[in-house]
Amino acid sequence: MLYRVGPSMIRRLVLDVLKPYRPSVVDLSLALSNLDGIEGVNIIIYEIDQHVENAKITIVGTEVEFDVVKKKLEEMGATIHSVDEVASGKKLIEAVKTPQDVSARI
């Protein structure tokens, strides 16, 4: 399935990913940052198991294509657990806290 959000596409994508030890986070970050439309990649490893690492991957760009990112991750042996944030449109909107968020995670 191809995810398109108008002409500007996705501008920020935050993924929870399970990846093997190899390739390294450096190699994975460089591979993702070389995809068309991507301007920056940030990978944080938040858990290490015996054979895999859990990573939060933040990708920003002018035209981030979800399916292209997913395919590259799969080629490198990684699996997307969840899509934690998507921002699209002409302007990036930051999340703001509201009174309803007191018990919610943001």
Residue ranges and their predicted role:
Residues 20-40:
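Short amphipathic alpha-helix segments
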Residues 40-43, 78-89:
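Conserved short beta-strand edge segments in small beta-sheet-based binding/regulatory domains
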Residues 21-22, 60-66:
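Helix N-cap motif at beta-to-alpha junctions
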Residues 16, 58-60:
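Short hydrophobic/aromatic beta-strand micro-patches
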Residues 8-19:
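Short glycine-/aliphatic-rich beta-strand segments at the starts of folded cytosolic domains
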Residues 46-51:
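A short beta-turn/loop motif at secondary-structure boundaries
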Residues 54-56, 90-106:
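Short, low-order "capping/linker" segments at domain edges
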Residues 27-32, 68-77:
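Short amphipathic alpha-helices in soluble, non-transmembrane regions
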